[in-house]
Amino acid sequence: MASDPTSSPFQPSSSLYQGATLLYPFAPGIFLPYEYDGLRVEAAAARTTAWIGTQLMISPIYDVKGPDAVEFLNSICTNDFSKLGPKGLRHAILCNEKGQIMTDGVVIKLGENHFRTYWLNPPIDFLLKNSNLRVEGTDQSLTEYFIQIAGEKSLEILENACEGDLHDLKFATHRTVSIDGKQMRVIRLGMTGNLAYEVHGPIQEFEDIYQRICSVGERFGARKLGMNAYSGPNHTPGGYPNIHIHYPLPWFESETGRYKGLSAYLAQNPQLGWFNLNRQLTGSVGNELEERFVTPYDVGWGNLVKLEKSGDFLGKTALTELAASNRRTVVSLEWNADDVASVYATQLRGRDTQPCEPIDMQLDMYYQANAVSLNKGDGVIYRADRVLAGDKPIGISTGRVIDYHYNRMISLGFIDKTNATIGSELSVIWGTPGTPQKKVRVKVAKLPYHDSVRNEERDVSDVPRWAPQSRLT
């Protein structure tokens, strides 16, 4: 990891904090901007102009290199890396022997037998250190900056910032460009569901690149994005289930096969395992941890499970069986406004009535509470509520948010396929066991919930193309 503190973008003088009104203590010495203009304004920018975010600067980054790099990745991931080209990437998934997701993230190819992974650590480091293959792993966390530009104006902003044409960059590909002679990697990828890009480069060059992008972005009406507006308000309406947001990971519940010893490894490296260490479980699912773990099929990623690839890989036997049953899928759930109001009204019925848990929060990501609980040695809070068809449990609801662009309360549901038809009337049980519980009617809605053209389907030929005569002054 980066050892030079002067190269950190988290220094008090960093332009990262310019305009921030609240900060979030993510880790010792690392404060993330929590809000700039507020969640309503920041999240909505992706649907009209764009937002510029830096939340993923804290990403676990891990390089895999060596003659057997492809074989190693194929043995631990559901994906097939044997034909990955020099400009390509994979949305990689690691599973345990039950077929449950252990982590997922992006893998890009940097060179022959050299791959960079995002969010696959710590499982990937544990597996590599216990592998007999000719590979080596290097933790690259905090050595590169990670800037996201998401929204309808994102391509125009990026082209004007680097003064070059990026219209040829296809979805899920990357290439190198420069700003004022500084090399950076641009990836066409994002979490809002619509047109979006990522920019990566040496951490020492963050200030110059970030200031340039923000300066150009301001002219296009872009907004800086804080942590509060990042997770739920983008991933849930964008139709992207996300680790550590919509579901926990079974890092301490997978002591079989190649994962035997992982719990001890994480106990020795608690800073790597804190997302799933001493979890606090809320919502009507209660302490039923197994119900919260998901498979690739539960979250709609069956296309990323390559059962036909040569060789064995972690979870293949279970995933083969799950593919045959393929019982659950992911949907958007639209919450009934009157029922939500009824739950909220319990807060106002006097001291003789025990109120339900608050439902007026903008999103079910407990940043403030997590900061306090982690300082006390407790774990991250995960909420999941039970979904019913009539009185029959059919799955869970997670990632509840108020979407201010559509003026709706929505969540993602991992539910039985037989009840996943758009328009189906279901209900969610609101309330952690031991607190008052109420049914809230929900309706299955399209996934993703938003109406934007998805990034992978977006034809950018209608986006104004940068040319030297269009240079901003």
Model regions and ranges:
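Acidic, proline/glycine-enriched N-terminal capping motif
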Residues: 1-95, 100, 330
